[in-house]
A protein has these predicted regions:
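Catalytic center-proximal scaffold of phosphoryl-transfer enzymes
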Residues: 1-277, 281
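Compositionally biased, low-complexity segments
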Residues: 280, 290-292
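Short, intrinsically disordered C-terminal tails of secreted or membrane-associated proteins
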Residues: 297-300
């Protein structure tokens, strides 16, 4: 499963749009909070098992499941360090990390399955060597003075600030198994693009409209979007799906029995979906004064 979140404006305030998606299902919802409070309130990801692909947000790491980190994020950070912080002048470890990740991806794609243990060990050794080179060039800053000194104005309290390179290297070392999960576990992708794509259309909508004026409007929009995105993944005709809602014969998604999709802490299943979805779409059309297309005009679309 893939999970991600992005900021949106609802009722003039910052909210967070959360998504949980698979190859065949999409679920989106907005909440004022970004982390675990939103997961609990929305019923999102609380019981997820298997592998969860995400971008490394701390709240995701607290979930009791196997984790895989998005390497597109890592590559972007490594490119920045290589090009903007003059790392290429001194050592070149960041560029070599990028090349090693891409090489691993190519080998996994060519094999169509996790790599043999000997190749995994080779990549592990290369990764360890690059981490050591990077850490030699970007050592962690150590606290100077004592807490008593800080109270007297000497030194600073709390964790010492680190460079972007040092922070990235620490994360890549601490979560190295999650970085290389795509190489060791069957079917785990290299990136979290599936979740980011699920959020993209809603960001475009926000650029056009500016924000959602009410929480109810946001809930309505994301419910409809969840249904249509799911049916699109399952190769259904979306116009037929909408017609089926109004005809009270809703075309049902094919749900994976291992996955529960929840909305407002209520299970979104085959029993509750038709009426819930129909009422939601009707309210959306009424509130936005959308005029139905005459049947004679259907052929034009």
């Amino acid at each position: 499963m893939h999970a991600d979140e992005t900021g949106i404006r609802v009722e003039g305030k910052l909210h967070w749009l959360h998504c949980a998606v698979t190859d065949t299902l999409s679920w989106l919802a907005a909440h004022p909070k970004r982390g675990s409070q939103a997961f609990e309130a929305l019923g999102l990801l609380q019981g997820v098992k298997g592998v969860l692909v995400h971008d490394g947000l701390v709240s995701y790491k607290a979930l009791d499941c196997t984790h895989s980190l998005c390497n597109a994020h890592h590559i972007r950070e490594l490119v920045y360090i290589h090009e903007q912080e003059n790392e290429k002048i001194w050592d070149g470890w960041a560029q070599e990390m990028i090349e090693l990740l891409v090489q691993g991806l190519k080998e996994v794609d060519a094999a169509g399955k996790p790599l043999p243990l000997d190749r995994q060990a080779w990549f592990e050794a290369q990764w360890s060597a690059l981490l050591e080179r990077g850490e030699d060039s970007n050592p962690q800053n150590q606290r100077t003075g004592t807490s008593q000194d800080a109270g007297m104005g000497i030194g600073k309290r709390g964790r010492p600030s680190q460079s972007k390179a040092a922070n990235l290297l620490r994360r890549l070392r601490e979560h190295r198994q999650d970085v290389w999960r795509f190489m060791t576990d069957e079917g785990v992708p290299f990136t979290n693009n599936l979740a980011e794509q699920a959020l993209r259309m809603s960001k475009v909508k926000q650029k056009i409209s500016g924000c959602f004026r009410t929480a109810h409007g946001a809930h309505t929009f994301f419910t409809i979007r969840s249904y249509l995105a799911t049916m699109n993944k399952q190769k259904a005709n979306l116009f037929d799906c909408l017609l089926s809602v109004f005809n009270r014969q809703t075309i049902q998604p094919c749900f994976n029995p291992r996955l529960s999709i929840r909305t407002s802490s209520k299970l979104w299943d085959a029993d509750t979906l038709p009426k819930f979805l129909m009422d939601t779409i009707r309210n959306f059309l009424c509130n936005h004064r959308v005029t139905a297309i005459p049947r004679s005009e259907h052929a034009r679309f």
